[in-house]
């Protein structure tokens, strides 16, 4: 039976180490120990999570920028790709022992589901609609969370720094807009910032896909020297 389990990174691929112990009773106790290495060859879930976040963010912020009204397309993306896909990616990252990615993808997946719930619950009269100050507090809390997560990206790559940095700005701009009752022009400008944020996540996700497929850097991520 395995008595210990740990993961190590080997060229970006975790290796699962299972330690087996066998005991023999003679005049005393002797222990034989062997280690079996199992290389993790499962696919990288990060591109799925980044694309789910990025595409949904672009579509929502096209609404914020004034291109169309909020509609079922945005809500469906929030439930399925922005919500469910990110949660799946986060669970897969948990299996790989990636605390940062697990926290990010599961949290933002649940953010999208909670945002849809805020809209739908009010429409169904299952609760009072959130006023602007409540929404400002909601968005500011997510902005604070994202700002702290941004610090973590300083050890990762430039592409993720852009994603989390622009997302932090987006959350606080949205919070300010709701708290102050900002003009339509301010909210439209915030929408354009959100479109940029979404496309930066799409870039980061597709870069990982193409770089792996071609076995070389097709789209640079700007790796940080540790």
Question: Where are the regions that the model predicts?
Answer:
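Helix-adjacent hinge/juxtasegments
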Residues: 102, 106, 110-137
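Structural signature of hydrophobic alpha-helical transmembrane segments
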Residues: 70-82, 129-141, 164, 191-195
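N-terminal topogenic module of multi-pass integral membrane proteins
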Residues: 31-89, 93
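Short, highly charged, low-complexity non-transmembrane loops/tails of multi-pass membrane proteins
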Residues: 215-226
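C-terminal ends of transmembrane helices
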Residues: 86-96, 148-155
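Short, Lys/Arg-enriched N-terminal segments with co-localized hydrophobic residues
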Residues: 10-30
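Alpha-helical membrane segments in multi-pass integral membrane proteins
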Residues: 137-148, 158-179, 186-207
